[in-house]
């Protein structure tokens, strides 16, 4: 499933150019740069997941099943149980620290499931890069929180939850195919939220005109 990944590779190249060898993913740099790096990583992860979701759907899910599955219990996302904003107005009402806390909770919920994706997808971009970029982004969010909270190191997590692992053998199990389909859908939704929250922060702090993210 290698189609549709050009934009993901482009974002990966940008990140590589911005992270010289031997340096931490998020060194001691200005707030604007920290936030810009976090947005780029969130964009990259969201794009790779969206491409993978589309390719998986085309490969494993019959067309007559796709829309019905999107409304089924299999598509329920754990992230819907936390008080994270789901629309633009609510997002703008939250503080920057709140948006970072929501983002951190969403990212951490995928750390374990993503590691099992190496067995499901031979795509090297997905298998090797997403977990590392999640870890980089987690580190970046902690750096942003320390920057915004006068260097305090707190337990910023909202809830401790994680998604189930992906089924590594969807070819032989229809339930497994649907489970993976649902998990990828949730992953895509959650990363879209994280990207949106970070873009709102960036817009509020560093864009002079009205923020319309």
UniProtKB/Swiss-Prot annotation:
It is found in: Secreted. The keyword RNA-binding does not apply. One of its GO terms (molecular function) is growth hormone receptor binding. Its main location: secreted. InterPro entries: 4_helix_cytokine-like_core (IPR009079), Somatotropin (IPR034975), Somatotropin/Prolactin (IPR001400), Somatotropin_CS (IPR018116). Keywords: Disulfide bond, Hormone, Secreted, Signal. Disulfide bonds join 77-186, 203-211. The keyword Disulfide bond applies. GO terms for cellular component: extracellular space. Residues 1-25 form the signal peptide. Transmembrane segments: none annotated. PROSITE patterns: SOMATOTROPIN_1 (PS00266), SOMATOTROPIN_2 (PS00338). Belongs to the somatotropin/prolactin family. This is Somatotropin. The gene is GH.
């Amino acid at each position: 499933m290698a189609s549709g990944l050009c934009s993901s590779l482009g974002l990966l190249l940008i990140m590589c150019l911005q992270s010289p060898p031997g340096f931490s993913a998020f060194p001691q740099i200005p707030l604007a740069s920290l936030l810009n790096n976090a947005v780029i990583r969130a964009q990259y992860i969201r794009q790779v997941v969206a491409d993978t979701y589309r390719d998986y759907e085309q490969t494993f899910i019959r067309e007559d099943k796709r829309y019905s599955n999107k409304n089924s219990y299999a598509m329920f996302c754990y992230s819907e149980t936390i008080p994270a904003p789901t629309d633009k107005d609510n997002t703008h009402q939250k503080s920057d620290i709140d948006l970072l806390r929501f983002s951190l909770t969403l990212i951490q919920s995928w750390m374990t499931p993503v590691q099992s994706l190496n067995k499901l997808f031979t795509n090297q971009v997905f298998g090797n890069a997403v977990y590392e970029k999640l870890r980089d982004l987690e580190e970046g969010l902690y750096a942003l929180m320390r920057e915004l909270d006068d260097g305090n190191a707190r337990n910023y997590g909202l809830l401790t939850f994680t998604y189930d692992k992906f089924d590594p053998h969807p070819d032989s199990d229809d339930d497994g195919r649907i489970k993976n389909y649902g998990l990828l859908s949730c992953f895509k939704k959650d990363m879209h939220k994280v990207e949106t929250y970070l873009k709102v922060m960036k817009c509020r702090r560093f864009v002079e005109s009205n923020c319309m993210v």
